[in-house]
Each structure stands twice: as structure tokens, then as C-alpha cells.
């Protein structure tokens, strides 16, 4: 084994021929780092010895991890050998300074002439030998522990085989028990079919809900599209009003510049322009009222659609509550099934104990009967296992149904938020419409009824009408801009 933390690493290996004539001791050696100052031949031998010792330590680590039980069973020869050669051919000759000289020679046939001489202190060799003895003792303890565990496992296997053989007694009781198990399996089959039907109904309702959600999405897209179109129309009308306002300003400038020169011509022109702009204003007012009525109708339709959607959401919530109640009933049923399974397992354990007592008394007098009872017991165990699988499957189904209901609740909550936002926007638009209507009514009420008196009656009339047109255009422009915002 390897010892870490020393300047030179020494590994021992006991073999059948460890005792050699002349007091020679065989050791496995890894060269120290200070040997780099030696001649070139010694460096080559050191590299080969280090590689060989790494391989040997890897093999010994595998042995220590459990691949081989003990180092004493290895039949491989050591890779390197260390021989302590006594001084003057005497077996007990050691240097006066406590140093042991060793000769390292390869065991291969093609390296018989490679020999290297090294030296170690006796204290270091003693420490390495004590470390190796401790490691061997620990390995022996581990081997004894492993063999003891193996014997315990054999005894446990024997006990288990005896317990399996013991479970083949009292045929009549087991037959009645098997009938009870078969009836329980039939009831569980009916429960499984009812659960499958409930899951199919739930899937159908989920499909209906998805279709309703898609219809609501399409309606919301149509509403958004119509709202965008109305905004575009309002922008166009606002542009027309801006152009009319600019024309009015130009006409006002022209009228002011040519008041004294062409009173009659300007009067006729202003009358024509006034009639034209008054006609345009009436048309714009009619269009505005028509668009306003259309928007009111659209808002009513939207409110109706929102009410329908809220009604559908309420129905979906009622369905979800019903499904929650069904899931609670299924949970109770699964709990009762688990309690029944535990009760049956307890009965099976008690009957097995009674069978064991009877078997100890009867000492296996009827092997055919015992074989039949063993078959019945195995069939009962299989049925119990099948029952456990069914309970586990039902629990999975219930969990999946609960997850689907939670997801559906989240979707319904999201739809409620969306409907609330739409209602807020509709209320905001209605408030803006009422505000605009109030402004228009106020401006129409404050419109001047009499013309201002000036020197030129025609110009005064034209100026008052132009001012009225300008005020109406400004109010319409403000209303359009506010509504577009």
C-alpha cells in the first residue's frame, strides 16, 4: 500500500519466498524526487519504477475497494524488488548512521542488468511497515464483516422462504376472502366506468368553453376594427373642417379688404358662400348625428355582448362548482377505497400469522393442498396489487381534473378582467359623448340671433354669418379632436 506525505514512498509485498539467504528483505519501491541529480541510467530506472509502482497502487486500490478480498491471495509477482544487502556479507550489518542501503532490480527478463542502489533511514522503514500492518488489519476486519453480513442475508432468505410456504393453509377462509375481493373488484370497475363518463363530460364542457372564448375573441376583434374605422372617419372630417376654417379665414380677409370697393359683389358672394357653408354644416351635423347614433347602437350591442359573456361566465362558474362537488365526492370515495384496502391488508397479515401457527402444528402433511393454497394466495396478492394500481390511477385522474379546473378558473378570471376593462372604456366614451353633446348644446344656445349694426348693412350681415360659421366650425373641430382622443 502507498504512504503519502513522505520524501520517498515504499510499498511492501509479502510473497512465499520473502525470506532469502543472507538476511535479504523484498520490498516494493517508489523513488524520491532528489534522485534527479544521479546519473542518466539512474533517472531511467527511476521513471520505470515510478510507472510500475503507480500501476501496482491502482491494482491495490481496486483490491481495497472490494474487487479482491485480501492482499495475501494475489499471485502476481511484485514489479520492483528491494534487497537490503548487509555490509561485509553479514546479515545484521547496518550503517552506523541508521541508514539502510537497498538494491532495486527489475523482475522482467529483458531488464535483468538494470540495478540501482538507494538508501533509507530505519525509522522511515519501520513507519512504513507499521502502516502496512494497520492497513492489513483493517482489511481483515472488513472481510470478516462482509462474510458476517452474507450469513445474515442467507438466514433472512431462509426465513422469507419459510414465511412464503406458511401462507398456504385454511382453504375455505381464503376462498371466501377471494370472493370478497372479486366483489370489491367489480365495484371498483363500476366506479372506474363512472369516472370515465365524468371525465368525458368534463372534456365536452371544456371544448364548449373554448368555442365560446373564441367567439368572444372574434367579437372583440370586430369591435376594435369598427372603432378604428370610426376614428379614421373622424380624422377625415376633422381635416375637412380645418380646410373649411382656413377658407373662412381667407374669405374674411378678402371681405375686409374689399368692403368699400365692391359691396354688392361681396354681398352676393357672401350670401352664396354662406348658403353653401350652411348647407355643408347641416350635412356635417346630420352625419355627426348619424355617426353618434351608430356609435350608441354599437355600444348597446357591446353591452349586450358583454352581458351574454358574463352570463356564460356565470354558467361556467356554476359548472365548475358542480365539478368541484363531484371531485370532493370522488376524493371521499378514494379515501374509503384506501381504508378498505388497508383493512384487507391487515386481515391478510392476521390470517398469514394464523396460517403460520397452523403450519407449525401440522408440519406440512398435505403438499397438494398447500400448493393449491399457495396459488390462491398468489392470486389474492395479484388482486390486491391490481386494486392498488386502480386506486393510484383514480388519484391521478382526480389530480388532473383539479388542475384543469384551476386552469379554467384562471381563464374565467382573465375574461372577467377583460370585460371590466371594456365596460370602463364604454363608460368613458359615453361620458365624452355626453360632454360633447352638452358643449354643442351650449354653443348653439349662445349663438347670436341678431346681426351687428355697422355702416354697411351687407358687410355687417356677412361678418356676423361668417363669425357664426367660424364658431360652429371651431366647436365641431374641438368636439372631433376630443372624441378622437
Swiss-Prot record:
Q: Which residue intervals are annotated with compositional bias (Low complexity) in the record?
A: 1-18
Its cellular-component GO annotations read: cytoplasmic side of plasma membrane; I band
Reading the lineage from the top rank, the first entry is Eukaryota
Its BP terms in the Gene Ontology are: intracellular signal transduction
UniProt region (Disordered), positions on chain? 1-21, 40-65
State the similarity comment.
Answer: Belongs to the MYZAP family.
| The name this protein goes by in its record | Myocardial zonula adherens protein
